[in-house]
Amino acid sequence: MTFRNCVAVDLGASSGRVMLARYERECRSLTLREIHRFNNGLHSQNGYVTWDVDSLESAIRLGLNKVCEEGIRIDSIGIDTWGVDFVLLDQQGQRVGLPVAYRDSRTNGLMAQAQQQLGKRDIYQRSGIQFLPFNTLYQLRALTEQQPELIPHIAHALLMPDYFSYRLTGKMNWEYTNATTTQLVNINSDDWDESLLAWSGANKAWFGRPTHPGNVIGHWICPQGNEIPVVAVASHDTASAVIASPLNGSRAAYLSSGTWSLMGFESQTPFTNDTALAANITNEGGAEGRYRVLKNIMGLWLLQRVLQEQQINDLPALISATQALPACRFIINPNDDRFINPETMCSEIQAACRETAQPIPESDAELARCIFDSLALLYADVLHELAQLRGEDFSQLHIVGGGCQNTLLNQLCADACGIRVIAGPVEASTLGNIGIQLMTLDELNNVDDFRQVVSTTANLTTFTPNPDSEIAHYVAQIHSTRQTKELCA
């Protein structure tokens, strides 16, 4: 038997993991083993909301060292993270300023300013990226306006996965899929857009030309002295998750479900017409030149905050209690920007219901029911928008990522959307990360080849829509007339 051992470092907004993948060439089987899992979260520092990148780096190194201590020879390493955030470095590679998180309020008002000064359509035609108030475009503008004293010291700006790869290898890289989330990459040239960079106040010299997934950035020297290639995978975690989505045919849509919910489809061409602009559709970069035509949905962030505020540790028990409640008594729009980072999520949800003359969710189960029903209804809205955009309905929806373990939400999604839902794999970002590594090692031909491996090895569960469910009746009778507010558009 011929084996490959690849390590995926997968960092999310709430947690991170170092995973070891073992690929057997002859039987084309792939197994994952968790080596190290650790928490991630927002911190308050000098008036900013920040990430603790030093702690994350220590956790990454701890996980890698654990693999080496087992005597396993690693063939390659890949790192994926969330998008838009960055770390600034000086000429010596030392950090400049703080690693500010996208949920910080420093960008307030800057998106509207950009649209007024540059033109909303022009920005969209250049980047193809949706308007979100925390995009890197506005973060850099906030930096240059609010902290001009830092500018003379900045030599490089690295997005999060590129920063951690740099810390392992000493080599800098700007990976394409994550770079597109910045709203600074020109959709026609796949390079940084000079007009958008100029408005942001950033110097183009801070960035290198984006590279597509599959190149070796450099090498990490393990404690035993071996040089291990660090591969530029599809380093935006959603891009990796889509690679591992076992999409079958052109009528399959995906939903990457986690802190954020990203719903979309793959396309060989971007959608940047007026319909796409009005719907705030994004065209993020994917592997092999494909576009991830998708829409951001606030996702399980709302639930994560409720769990934290209410100190709930038993999620299965909460879901069980939630399932016993009637559907659609409390409906909010999860994409309202009031939910980006409120002081207390529970109070914000209750206020939204009060302002719309609905019953007020009081118990933990009622709050969760409100979130699940509202997400499922928004999923139905977005799926309909995407189908209209491309002029063809979808036949099935693949839900991947940690959120696909929520069987109640999966069934609500199937019922609200009226479509077959296939849930899994859970560790989609990790698997997609591994997939690019295996292609770089010449073990697999392309993304479609890798998806065949995923389809035969992953644990997938099908949810069939129930047209007689409460939420299906709600969609048919009431929800179809509802207008949903765009997320920060």
UniProtKB/Swiss-Prot annotation:
Induction: Induced by L-rhamnose via the RhaR-RhaS regulatory cascade. Binding of the cAMP receptor protein (CRP) is required for full expression. Also induced by L-lyxose. It holds the Pfam family FGGY_N. Optimum pH is 8.5. The active site is at residue 237. Disulfide bonds join 68-222, 353-370, 413-417. Its EC number is 2.7.1.5. It comes from the Bacteria. The keyword Phosphoprotein does not apply. Keywords: ATP-binding, Disulfide bond, Kinase, Magnesium, Nucleotide-binding, Rhamnose metabolism, Transferase. Gene3D superfamilies: 3.30.420.40. InterPro entries: ATPase_NBD, FGGY_C, FGGY_N, Rhamnulokinase. It can also use manganese, cobalt, iron, calcium and copper ions. Disruption phenotype: Cells lacking this gene are unable to utilize rhamnose as a source of carbon. Involved in the catabolism of L-rhamnose (6-deoxy-L-mannose). It could also play a role in the metabolism of some rare sugars such as L-fructose. Catalyzes the transfer of the gamma-phosphate group from ATP to the 1-hydroxyl group of L-rhamnulose to yield L-rhamnulose 1-phosphate. Uridine triphosphate (UTP), cytidine 5-triphosphate (CTP), guanosine 5-triphosphate (GTP), and thymidine triphosphate (TTP) also can act as phosphoryl donors. It can also phosphorylate L-fuculose and L-xylulose. HAMAP family: Rhamnulokinase. Monomer. NCBIfam families: PRK10640.1, rhamnulo_kin. This is L-Rhamnulokinase.
